[in-house]
């Protein structure tokens, strides 16, 4: 990295920002931007309007690595002063040196993920902060990169699992749970700012508190254990006060999840703790799961899914899977297809297995040809979409609560409790006439569902 002298801005220093990767990386970006704003920096929407640029990278799969390297290159070409942070910053090249520094030696500095303090130190070094920070001008909820009516709430960092296809622990470290009081304070500030939906995220939401032995914290004078079940209950109580939603992501299928389902189905938190689980099953055959080092047993998972649906018939389950994992036989793949049909998962994504540099799965025998992996992914998605279409068709004729995300010339676009933003379906709301006068973005409206197609619904207010 070059020893570049500090930039001397002619007015208020401006920082450009590029955020790549998953919602967890987005939260890291929000924290950095919040701190920049608190210290008096302006955020520039263009390269040429910025004194320097921060690029928050992703390094999980090869495509993400290339996208991040390209983004860094673009920022260097367009601006020339670039600080890099994020998962790719922790990735080494084949020679053992930093990958980013090797590909782009002109960057000013590189940090790993979840490195607010380091990033700010580098910003201060290369672009000294203003003398009069305006901390009071920054909202208590912080600066958010999502629309104003929903936000991601990250409850922990890192992961204790060592799945063979994943390199996240090498980049983000072991599980570190946030203090429950900090999580609740952020949630309250977000609700106060007008957020109508909180999306709880982490690498492993079910493991929240394991690292601190579920120690008891306090919020508004009440004891709350650092444990997923207790946190969800507290968030549900808070959401009920603001008429808002709480949605759970990255939930491993541990027995403790059984304690959360009743909150979705009945009691004071029904309608606030959404009947929605994002559960990364990844596969269903025990031998494949063993090679993946996944903390799950397929038979017990099926029993658990059935139990969840018995407790909460409206439950929506989203999951992701990998097809064509090293050593996967056709018989094992058929077991996966059978699981999808029997479990009747509502929302499903699938990746054809792709080697990730640094993953231990690369050392496994039985690597499958690209065409086999892609063919299995296509077959998987065909079955998954059939199941999803049957599930969603059952909603026609029902009246559902919808959170409005957008209003345009054709009417409104929103989501039900079964739809997370950006990854699930939407509801197209008619009529278009006077839509903007009847409701606004962030409102909840009751919609009579009149049609379904693929992952989306159509309806009328």
Swiss-Prot record:
Binding site residues for [4Fe-4S] cluster 1: 22, 58, 87
User: Could you tell me which PROSITE patterns the record lists for this protein?
Assistant: MTTASE_N (PS51449), MTTASE_RADICAL (PS01278), RADICAL_SAM (PS51918), TRAM (PS50926)
> So what EC number does this one have?
2.8.4.4
Q: Which reaction does it catalyse?
A: L-aspartate(89)-[ribosomal protein uS12]-hydrogen + (sulfur carrier)-SH + AH2 + 2 S-adenosyl-L-methionine = 3-methylsulfanyl-L-aspartate(89)-[ribosomal protein uS12]-hydrogen + (sulfur carrier)-H + 5'-deoxyadenosine + L-methionine + A + S-adenosyl-L-homocysteine + 2 H(+)
Q: Where found? A: Cytoplasm
**Record text on cofactor binding:** Binds 2 [4Fe-4S] clusters. One cluster is coordinated with 3 cysteines and an exchangeable S-adenosyl-L-methionine.
Protein's GO biological process: tRNA modification
Keywords, alphabetical:
4Fe-4S, Cytoplasm, Iron, Iron-sulfur, Metal-binding, S-adenosyl-L-methionine, Transferase
Q: Which Gene3D superfamilies match?
A: Methylthiotransferase, N-terminal domain, Nucleic acid-binding proteins, tm_1862 like domain
TRAM domain span: 393-461
* Protein name per UniProt: Ribosomal protein uS12 methylthiotransferase RimO
Family statement drawn from the similarity comment of this UniProt entry = Belongs to the methylthiotransferase family. RimO subfamily.
User: Which Pfam families does the annotation name?
Assistant: Radical_SAM (PF04055), TRAM_2 (PF18693), UPF0004 (PF00919)
What are the cysteine partners in each disulfide bond?
A: none
Instruction: Return the InterPro entries for the record.
Output: Elp3/MiaA/NifB-like_rSAM (IPR006638), Methylthiotransferase (IPR005839), Methylthiotransferase_CS (IPR020612), Methylthiotransferase_N (IPR013848), Methylthiotransferase_N_sf (IPR038135), NA-bd_OB-fold (IPR012340), Ribosomal_uS12_MeSTrfase_RimO (IPR005840), rSAM (IPR007197)
In this chain the MTTase N-terminal domain maps to 13-128
Under the cellular component aspect of Gene Ontology, which terms does the record hold? cytosol
What biological function has been recorded for the protein in this entry?
Answer: Catalyzes the methylthiolation of an aspartic acid residue of ribosomal protein uS12.
């Amino acid at each position: 990295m070059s020893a570049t002298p500090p930039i001397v801005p002619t007015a208020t220093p401006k920082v450009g920002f590029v955020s790549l990767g998953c919602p967890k990386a987005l939260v890291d970006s929000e924290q950095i931007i919040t701190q920049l704003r608190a210290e008096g920096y302006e955020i520039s929407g263009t390269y040429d309007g910025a004194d320097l640029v921060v690029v928050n990278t992703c390094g999980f799969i090869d495509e993400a690595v290339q996208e991040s390297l390209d983004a860094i290159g673009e920022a260097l070409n367009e601006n020339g002063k670039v600080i890099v942070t994020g998962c790719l910053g922790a990735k080494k090249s084949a020679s053992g040196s930093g990958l980013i520094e090797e590909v782009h030696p002109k960057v000013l500095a590189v940090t790993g993920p979840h490195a607010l303090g380091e990033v700010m130190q580098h910003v201060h070094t290369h672009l000294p902060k203003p003398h009069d920070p305006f901390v009071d001008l920054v909202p208590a909820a912080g600066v958010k990169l999502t629309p104003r009516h929903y936000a991601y709430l990250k409850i922990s960092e890192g992961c204790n699992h060592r799945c063979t296809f994943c390199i996240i622990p090498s980049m983000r470290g072991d599980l570190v749970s946030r203090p429950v009081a900090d999580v609740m304070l952020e949630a309250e500030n977000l609700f106060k700012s007008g957020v109508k939906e909180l999306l709880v995220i982490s690498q492993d939401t079910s493991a929240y508190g394991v690292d601190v032995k579920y120690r008891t914290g306090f919020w508004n004078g009440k004891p709350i254990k650092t444990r997923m079940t207790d946190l969800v209950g507290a968030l549900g109580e808070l959401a009920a006060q603001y008429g808002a939603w709480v949605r759970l992501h990255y939930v491993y299928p541990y027995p403790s999840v059984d304690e959360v389902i009743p909150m979705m189905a009945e009691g004071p938190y029904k309608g606030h703790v959404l009947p929605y689980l994002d559960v990364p099953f990844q596969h269903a055959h025990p031998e494949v799961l063993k090679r993946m080092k996944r903390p799950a047993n397929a038979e017990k998972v099926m029993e658990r899914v059935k139990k969840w649906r018995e407790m909460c018939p409206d439950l929506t389950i989203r999951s992701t899977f990998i097809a064509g994992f090293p050593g996967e036989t056709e018989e094992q793949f058929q077991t996966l297809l059978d699981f999808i049909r029997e479990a009747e998962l509502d929302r499903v994504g699938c990746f054809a297995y792709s080697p990730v540099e640094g993953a231990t799965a690369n050392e496994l025998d039985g690597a499958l040809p690209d065409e086999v992996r892609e063919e299995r992914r296509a077959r998987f998605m065909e079955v998954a979409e059939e199941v999803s279409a049957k599930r969603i068709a059952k909603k026609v004729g029902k009246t559902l609560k919808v959170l409005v995300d957008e209003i345009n010339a054709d009417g409104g676009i929103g989501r039900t409790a079964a739809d997370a933003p950006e990854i699930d379906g939407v509801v197209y709301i008619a009529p278009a006439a006077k839509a903007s006068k009847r409701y606004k973005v962030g409102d909840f409206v009751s919609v009579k569902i009149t049609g379904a197609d693929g992952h989306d619904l159509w309806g009328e207010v």
